[in-house]
Amino acid sequence: MQLTLWTYEGPPHVGAMRIAASMKGVHCVLHAPQGDTYADLLFTMIERRPGRPPVSYSTFNARHLGRDTAELVRETVTAAYERYQPEALLVGDSCTAELLQDQPGDLAQGMDLPVPVIGLELSAYSRKEGYGASEAFYQLVRGLLETNGASAGAQPDASRAPRANLLGPTSLGFRCRDDVQEVTRLLESVGVEVNVVAPLGASPEDLRRIPEADFNVCLYPEVARSTCEWLQRRFGQPTVTTVPLGLGATRDFLAEVGRVTGLDVSQGVADANARMAWYSRSVDSNYLTGKRVFIFGDGTHAVAAARIASEELGFEVVGLGTYAREEAREVRRAAKAYGVEPLITDDYLEVERAATEASPELVLGTQMERHIAKRLGVPCAVISAPVHVQDFPARYAPNMGLEGANVIFDTWVHPLMMGLEEHLLGMFKEDFEFTADAPSHLEAGAAPSPGGAAREEGQAETAVAVAESEEGAEVRWTPEAEAELKKIPFFVRGKARRNTERFAADRGIATITVETIYDAKAHFSR
């Protein structure tokens, strides 16, 4: 067990909650103690849902352990069915309740309720949230279709348009709502109808219609891969596995749809030329070429982000990793292609160390990487769950398809542009026009702070700055050297300071001057 301030994934039962919360007519019953009943906070505060998630808890405590806790499960399942009248029930236990070995899924299935009851065994002490969502969705789809007696998929019919299922979007996912809308529009542009979107917004009756489609689109492999593989074995439905994140992947996605359906999608591929393509070639974006980028997130978004960064924006990928061990193989393959060491970990401190060592100029990651980048003073864009409330925007902001490519360009490039602006302000902040005591350009400017001049005078009297080198030796910076260091762009200033201090310590230099900075630069440039 590890004590931590942050976790990229919750326990598996959180994944099961996400599936239930994504759907209509599905209720999740969890055998759980009082401390595991925090679903309301996740879904109402972070995702800004207008209603409570459809989850009920047995909520056992110490006094219940002296009697039959299995009876408490039956009472909770009965109460949940009578109150909510769901079309299907998911029943499992939380990580704490798993220790009791009450088997709540089996208990609920033995109650002969008039609705399908899907028991979940989620292996809480060896798996995490992503697996819980994948397993809950798979068991729900399989349970409903086998109960329904479905035996064959859709037969080819030239009189109608091909039909597709979009599988994988969930509550608490990254931009799922808008991605579904954009991919639906993209498919319709080449003559493909969307049959079912699941689990997001689907009902159990919708899941029973999945076999009516001609093929499945695995939009979010972390959730839908195992379900798509089973549907292909059971009903012969092919799966489109390309995720349309970025212009290149969108073209590949349309080409794969064309191969699966036999449609001529050449015009759609030719038209897949979003504004991002021009912007990334335009004069005002030339300075972006070669920017060092560190990427960390779920497997799907991390690998896609690396491709976009390298092939479409001309960035240099200096770090690539994921917290999802189920996606480690794909991330390792991509990392090898970009010549970097893959980072497979769910320890945010290890991610911070790797990001610091990589000295990136842009960080792409989750909510935690946003905090890491802020501490490092590096621009950041969020590309993957887990995210906080600001990444569930009220506006339309997909990441997939053509409009998604435009959104990605804006989201990634604007922090760099604003970073350049901050750097210029930093360079010229000593200019007489930018001092705190300078008169405002506004007609009724605020009066200058009376303490401003005193502060400036006090700063000027500071003779030297003291720093700790990596080897622990104390080195001093002259005021001229500190001023010269501030002229270096903020996103590499930390690296320049560390290199200079290391250079000085190695050579026994006690006081760093401007000449020392340039000597260190020449040394490390070789």
Swiss-Prot record:
Keywords: 4Fe-4S, ATP-binding, Bacteriochlorophyll biosynthesis, Chlorophyll biosynthesis, Iron, Iron-sulfur, Metal-binding, Nucleotide-binding, Oxidoreductase, Photosynthesis. Substrate binds at residues 419-420. It catalyses: chlorophyllide a + oxidized 2[4Fe-4S]-[ferredoxin] + 2 ADP + 2 phosphate = protochlorophyllide a + reduced 2[4Fe-4S]-[ferredoxin] + 2 ATP + 2 H2O. InterPro entries: ChlB/BchB/BchZ, LI-POR_suB-like_C, Nase/OxRdtase_comp1, P-CP_red_C, Protochl_reductB, Protochlorophyllide_Rdtase. Binds 1 [4Fe-4S] cluster per heterodimer. The cluster is bound at the heterodimer interface by residues from both subunits. Coiled coil: none annotated. The active site is at 284 (proton donor). Pathway: Porphyrin-containing compound metabolism; bacteriochlorophyll biosynthesis (light-independent). Belongs to the ChlB/BchB/BchZ family. Protochlorophyllide reductase is composed of three subunits; BchL, BchN and BchB. Forms a heterotetramer of two BchB and two BchN subunits. Component of the dark-operative protochlorophyllide reductase (DPOR) that uses Mg-ATP and reduced ferredoxin to reduce ring D of protochlorophyllide (Pchlide) to form chlorophyllide a (Chlide). This reaction is light-independent. The NB-protein (BchN-BchB) is the catalytic component of the complex. This is Light-independent protochlorophyllide reductase subunit B. It comes from Halorhodospira halophila (strain DSM 244 / SL1).
